[in-house]
Amino acid sequence: MSDADSLSCSLTLESDEYDEEEYDTNLSKLLENKTLNWIFVGGKGGVGKTTTSCSIAVQLAKRRESVLLLSTDPAHNTSDAFNQKFTNQPTLINSFDNLYCMEIDTTYSENTAFKLNKTEFFDSIIPELLQSFPGIDEALCFAELMQSIKNMKYSVIVFDTAPTGHTLRLLAFPELLKKALGYLISLREKLKGTLNMLKSFTNNEVELEGIYEKINHLNAMSISIQSNFQNPLKTTFVCVCIPEFLSVYETERLIQELTKKNISCYNIVVNQVVFPLDCPTVNVSHCEGLLKQIKDKKIQESFSSLVQKTKELEDVYISRRKLQSKYLTQIKNLYGNDFHIVCMPQLKSEIRGLENISNFSEMLLESKDIPIYRSEG
C-alpha cells in the first residue's frame, strides 16, 4: 500500500470508543505557555494560515515582552493582513510597542556563509562534492537564517510559513545539512592530502584549516537548530486546515512528518467552519397552507417565490454542513484525544486590518464544540 493510500485510509477511520474531548477547544494553553520561543503556523495554501498566525501574534503581544511575526511564505500576505508594508527587517506593527513583523525569502542567497574563501579550487571542487545532496544551497541559507533568528532578542517568534510542501522541505533542511557537512568532515584527511599535493604544484593558497573551521561551525549550527526544533518546551507547530478533503489530507501528512522529525504539534485550527444557525427551518407544507389563504395574486406569487428561495438557501446550508461534518468527524476521531482542536467560523468578509484581526484573535480563546451535523430525522 502506498503512503497516499495509507493516509487516505487513515482519514476514514472512525472511533466507536470516542467519548469526551480531553483537550480544550481553544488556544489558551498555547498562548499562556511562557517557555515557547518558536511557534510555526502551517498548512495547505488558502486555509487561513496568515490570519491565524497574525491573530496568535496579536494575542501573544498581550502576554509576552516582545513578539516577532516572521513570514517565510513567498506570497508574504502579512503586509496585506495588517494593511502595512513590511520588509526583511523587523518593523513595529502600527498600534503596538512590542509586536514586530518581517518578511523574508528562504531561497538561496549569495550571502550564505558557505561562500568561504574565494579560490578557484574551492569554488570548483566543493560544489562537485555537494552535488549528491540536492537542496544543500537552500539548506545552507536556511541554517544561516535560523541562526540569525535564534540570536534575535524576542520573547517569542511566530512563523507564518509557506504551504505544506515548502514547509516540509524547510523542516528537512537541518537533517540534510547534518548529512552533507558530516560527509565533508569525513573527507577531511583525504582532502588534506589532495590539497597539499595541489598546493605544491600551483600558486593557489588553500587555507584548509580555515575551510574546515567554517564547516565545523555550520555543522554545529545545524545541530543547534535541529535541537531547537525538537525541544517541545521551545518549539511547537500549529496546523491550520479547513473541513475539506485535500486540506485534511495535507494536515495528516504534515502531522506525520512532524512526528517523524520529533517536532511538537498539539494544536489544530479549523477555519471556515459553518456553525448551526439559530433559526427555524422552512416548513414547505405549512407555507403552502398559508399560501392558499392569501387572496391577492401578486402577494401570493411573491410569497411563493420567497418560500422557494428560502428553501434553496436552506438546502445549500444543510448540504454544506453535511459535507463539512464528514471531515470534522474525521478530524475529531483522528486528533480529538491528542490535540486542541479549534473551530473558527465562516465569516462574511475577509480578515484584513488590525481591528478585524484582533476580533478574530479573541475567537481563538473561545471554547466551541466541533459542530457535527445531525439530522433531526
UniProtKB/Swiss-Prot annotation:
Keywords: ATP-binding, Cytoplasm, Endoplasmic reticulum, Hydrolase, Nucleotide-binding, Transport. GO terms for molecular function: ATP binding; ATP hydrolysis activity. Its main location: cytoplasm. It is found in: Cytoplasm; Endoplasmic reticulum. Its EC number is 3.6.-.-. InterPro entries: Anion-transp_ATPase-like_dom, ATPase_ArsA/GET3, ATPase_ArsA/GET3_euk, P-loop_NTPase. The active site is at residue 73. ATP binds at residues 44-51, 244, 271. The keyword Transport applies. One of its GO terms (biological process) is tail-anchored membrane protein insertion into ER membrane. GO terms for cellular component: GET complex. It holds the Pfam family ArsA_ATPase. Homodimer. ATPase required for the post-translational delivery of tail-anchored (TA) proteins to the endoplasmic reticulum. Recognizes and selectively binds the transmembrane domain of TA proteins in the cytosol. This complex then targets to the endoplasmic reticulum by membrane-bound receptors, where the tail-anchored protein is released for insertion. This process is regulated by ATP binding and hydrolysis. ATP binding drives the homodimer towards the closed dimer state, facilitating recognition of newly synthesized TA membrane proteins. ATP hydrolysis is required for insertion. PANTHER family: ARSENICAL PUMP-DRIVING ATPASE ARSENITE-TRANSLOCATING ATPASE, ATPASE GET3. NCBIfam families: GET3_arsA_TRC40. Belongs to the arsA ATPase family. This is ATPase ASNA1 homolog. It comes from Plasmodium knowlesi (strain H). The lineage of its organism: Eukaryota, Sar, Alveolata, Apicomplexa, Aconoidasida.
